[in-house]
Amino acid sequence: MLTKRRMKFQYISCLAWLAHYDIFHLVPRDKNISYADLARAAGVPEQRLKSILRMAMTSSLFREHPNGTDVGHSAVSALLASDDDAYSYATYMCSKTAPMAMSMTEAHKRWGASTRTNETAYNVAFNTDLPFFDYLAQNKARMDEFARYMRSVRSSETVALKHLISGVDWESIPAGGMLVDVGGSTGGAAIALAQAYPHIRFTVQDLPENVETGEKAAAASLPADIASRLTFQAHDFTLPQPVRAADAYLLRMILHDWPDEQAVKILRNIVTAMDETKSRLFIMDTVLPKPGSVPISVERIARARDLTMIQSFNSKERELDEWKDLITAADPRLQLIGVTQPFGSAMSILEIQLSAK
């Protein structure tokens, strides 16, 4: 077992090395190249290159010609060479996720059970006193890398927008009703819903730079019948919600980034705007399974996401009971009226309303 674990660390180290020396792009897409020529192009020793590539080949990255002197792409390495988002996912895993994971022990030694967003494994790994997103914002290249990484994550079948579209009875919102996508980035979720449900109006809220990007893209590419139902609004969700009495508020992949104290504050800011006679709040996020309640391969992925939240933000993925506690802590009047996990989705949808009591 320990030997297998060692193989995984070595695979990550090979992936990082190959990306650093641009091997994915130096190997031609449609033909082989000799180890000697590839080593010269990359400026690395041929024997070192050969050792690292042959290790990578045991996990389906690249392939060696039977002559033993040439190398070409496999299906996986060709994908990474041709798809910028997939490549960014791989490089982010090597340059950010792996160092974070290895810094978790040191973070705990320094700060114990702190939930401060700038006392994390991420802070240790990258020697910064800034919270995750503040550190990203300092450097456009880091921001762009993270954006590509998130595009790759969101292209996964398990977090596809189709699960949001089919996972709620959106027809129950009356004609002309308003849905507010809180922290909706550049509007991807709202646009998908607008295409599927032409009777609903949408407000997408995010920080100014995301709102500006989304607004420009929508104006340039969306048909008038969709663009006319879509509004972008700059808003920090740690502040009170400005759109009052909407029919629905959506928090998709938001609260898992925040420790309980801040997550409660985000919820309270929405509660102050809700109308108890009609408003509903939908949270689409991971609901952690109970140990042993799902196949181990599924549970392993969920546990890995939980650790990533700890290492990045001192936050967490939450079990259902933890979600219930969080909702009650935000406001005892909030009632969880339904939990749905669409087939094939890694996330569940929690439907919440505000009672009159």
UniProtKB/Swiss-Prot annotation:
Loss of function: phenotype: Abolished completely the production of the naphthoquinones derived pigments and leads to the accumulation of four new compounds which lack the O-methyl group, including 6-O-demethyl-5-deoxyanhydrofusarubin and 6-O-demethyl-5-deoxyfusarubin.
Location of the active site: 256 (proton acceptor)
Xref: InterPro entries: COMT-like, O_MeTrfase_dom, SAM-dependent_MTases_sf, WH-like_DNA-bd_sf, WH_DNA-bd_sf
Keywords: Methyltransferase, S-adenosyl-L-methionine, Transferase
Induction, per UniProt: Expression is significantly up-regulated at the end of late growth phase, in the presence of Butyrolactone I. Expression is positively regulated by the pgm cluster-specific transcription factor pgmR.
PROSITE patterns per the UniProt record, alphabetical: SAM_OMT_II (PS51683)
A molecular function GO annotation: O-methyltransferase activity
Disulfide bond keyword on record: no
Any Pfam family: Methyltransf_2
KW Transferase (keyword) present: yes
Source organism, top-level taxon: Eukaryota
Residues the record lists as binding S-adenosyl-L-methionine: 206
Pathway in which this enzyme or protein is active: Pigment biosynthesis; Secondary metabolite biosynthesis
Enzyme Commission designation: 2.1.1.-
GO biological process: methylation; secondary metabolite biosynthetic process
Family statement: Belongs to the class I-like SAM-binding methyltransferase superfamily. Cation-independent O-methyltransferase family.
Reported function: O-methyltransferase; part of the gene cluster that mediates the biosynthesis of pleosporalin A, ascomycone A, as well as a third cryptic naphthoquinone derived pigment, all responsible for the coloration of conidia. The pathway begins with the biosynthesis of the cyclized heptaketide 3-acetonyl-1,6,8-trihydroxy-2-naphthaldehyde by the NR-PKS pgmA.
Name of the molecule in the record: O-methyltransferase pgmB
Gene it is expressed from: pgmB
